Regions:
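Structural signature of alpha-solenoid helical repeat junctions
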Residues: 79, 83, 100, 165-172, ...
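Long, ordered, amphipathic alpha-helical scaffolds
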Residues: 49-55, 250-315
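Alpha-helical repeat scaffolds
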Residues: 38, 84-93, 118-130, 190-199, ...
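Flexible helix-coil transition and linker loops at the boundaries of alpha-helical arrays
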Residues: 42-44, 91-98, 127-170, 200, ...
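Boundary/linker segments of alpha-helical solenoid repeat arrays
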Residues: 102-103, 132-142, 205-211, 237-251, ...
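Structural motif corresponding to the intra-repeat A-B loop/turn of tetratricopeptide repeats
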Residues: 81, 113-116, 187, 221, ...
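Extreme N-terminal leader/anchor segments
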Residues: 1-100, 270
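"A position-specific structural signal for the A-helix of alpha-solenoid helical repeats
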Residues: 10-11, 48, 52-62, 107, ...
Length: 315
């Protein structure tokens, strides 16, 4: 996922540069540093202020979840549910002010205590809302372009990556795609999960491990050709060592071999997962609570976080 601390300053910097096109290179560098350090100073529009409000609500929620981590189970669950309810109330207030605060809407949906099908329905409505806005109102955005940006938008040094990070609605849309893909995977809608994850993977400059969702889905579908075709693409893009260290690839390969009734190779693949991934064996043997993704799969803070995420998603 892309942190608000990355895309909100990029958006604010873009707005400032659009209204001050004649800044020198030195002034642009100073602006970049100042916006990153003091984003509130540049949040002059309702949308910008809504984005910062969202960041504040989310940061507070994550800090509080860290604080209560060592509470006894009953007290933890009660406190967590209260925190979720309070955060959702705050997020809904933001959404009432700004219908384009996509991440705020997404997190509000995730925090709602609704059945899977109802949650998926809400996420799909949000995805359509964000997509319609991007197609109709964002110059240069193109669903059919290789990385969602038409060539006409890639001028004056702009890249697909720089345009993506500076468009909060696009970032929110990508987060929504990932959330849908993960919920589809968790509810055994494997083809849909893979399809939504691939759409998130298409973006450039957007940090994501959505390839793991696709690999797990293809393994569940016993799609051997599709699995190894994607593995080859990832190997070419990132290098063989990074693929071989991916908990999602190693675990999905074990699942695929097991479902294909190749028991000995499956056991070897599972041992490789346990040996190569820190915490892999522990999480396989000890199902451990994982804080819900808020709103999507977070960057790891500890070396074993990736193995924990992969096992949780594959369960």
């Amino acid at each position: 996922m892309m942190e608000p601390s990355a895309y909100i300053p990029a958006y604010l910097e873009r707005l400032y540069l659009e209204s001050h096109p004649d800044l020198t290179d030195a002034a642009r560098e100073l602006l970049h540093r100042d916006v990153t350090a003091n984003p509130g100073k540049y949040a002059q529009t309702e949308h910008a202020q809504a984005l910062l409000s969202y960041q504040g609500v989310r940061d507070h929620l994550l800090d509080e979840l860290d604080r209560i981590e060592d509470m006894p189970d009953d007290e933890f669950e009660q406190t967590r549910n209260r925190l979720f309810d309070e955060a959702r109330d705050d997020l809904l207030k933001i959404c009432r002010v700004d219908a384009l605060a996509i991440d705020a809407q997404l997190l509000a949906v995730i925090l709602a205590d609704t059945p899977v099908d109802a949650c998926l329905g809400d996420l799909m409505k949000l995805e359509e809302h964000a997509r319609d806005y991007l197609v109709q109102s964002v110059p240069g955005f193109d669903l059919e372009a290789p990385h969602y940006w038409a060539n006409a938008a890639l001028v004056d040094g702009a890249t697909a990556a720089s345009l993506t990070v500076a468009e909060p609605v696009l970032v929110g849309w990508l987060h929504t795609l990932e959330s849908i893909s993960q919920l589809c995977l968790a509810s055994a809608r494997y083809r849909a999960g893979a399809a939504y994850a691939r759409r998130a993977l298409k973006a450039e400059g957007y940090p994501t491990r959505a390839a793991g969702t696709v690999l797990l889905a293809l393994a569940r579908l016993e799609d051997e050709d599709g699995f190894f075709e994607l593995a080859h693409e990832l190997e070419e893009a990132t290098g063989p060592e990074r693929l071989e260290d991916s908990p999602w690839y190693l675990l999905a390969r074990a699942i695929l071999l097991y479902k294909s009734n190749k028991m000995k190779p499956a056991k070897r693949a599972l041992r490789e997962f346990a040996n190569r991934c820190e915490g892999g064996a522990f999480f396989l043997l000890n199902p451990t609570y994982l804080t819900p993704y808020l709103p999507t799969r977070p960057a790891p803070r500890d070396p074993w976080d990736l193995a924990h995420q992969a096992v949780w998603e594959a369960d």
